Amino acid sequence: MRDVQSEKDHRNIPINMVGIKGLKYPIIVMDRTNKRQHTIGTFNLFVDLPKDFRGTHMSRFVEVLDRHNMKVTPKNMESILDDMREALKATVAHVTVDFPYFIRKNAPISGIGSYSSYNCGFISTKNKEFDFILKVEVPVLTVCPCSKEISDRGAHNQRAMVNVQVRMNSLVWIEEIIEMVEDAASAPIFTLLKREDEKFITEVSYDNPRFVEDVSREVVLRFMNDPRISWYRVEVSSQESIHNHEAYACIEKGKSL
């Protein structure tokens, strides 16, 4: 049978990244409370392709992923990348995976429990060195300090999304990232609240107003004081309740204006 993919290509143009995108696959990730958590990952898997190869072997990406028995950890990601490079005779391999991560949270006053979902992901590359980034998206509540200052009654508040990316020297739990981000906001967000909880969150957030600038800086302060975190990028986007636009702030370690 003719192997078209392995034929020589004469256009003399290498390809930086080729592979499969948007593959949904069951995965197991580490969980601080329960040791492991089953979820669904959406994968992008790419390698480089030399200038004289016409095509890559798409089926091998799935074969490599399947061999790892659904385990997706920082350590195992490097093993997946190494296997991809070997199976596809590549120099560079890239894997990104996005997944929902669930945490059991208790309401602040009633103590009633419910699950909260967070969009998380890993970004990994292997060339000569292994690079791994953890990303976590955390919804929080913000109250506008300016609105509070100038108003006789109340202040406008809204949900804000904090998108965090970190490189680590040693393990930082997803739960720890979420806790640091929630602590930097006016108040955390819960899936289930009773009336006494709503009262508490409303009053706590009012007493702790935050601009997007405040939230981004407060998150970064916590990252700077954690020796396990070697690099970070923090983006805060506030869904302004009294405007038809969003407020935005971004801080990245090592990036100048």
UniProtKB/Swiss-Prot annotation:
Pathway: Cofactor biosynthesis; 7,8-dihydroneopterin triphosphate biosynthesis; 7,8-dihydroneopterin triphosphate from GTP: step 1/1. This is GTP cyclohydrolase FolE2. Keywords: Hydrolase. It holds the Pfam family GCHY-1. NCBIfam families: PRK13674.1-1. It is an enzyme of class 3 (hydrolase). The lineage of its organism: Bacteria, Thermotogati, Thermotogota, Thermotogae, Kosmotogales. The keyword Hydrolase applies. GO terms for biological process: tetrahydrofolate biosynthetic process. The record marks C144 as: May be catalytically important. PANTHER family: GTP CYCLOHYDROLASE MPTA (PTHR36445:SF1). The keyword Transmembrane does not apply.
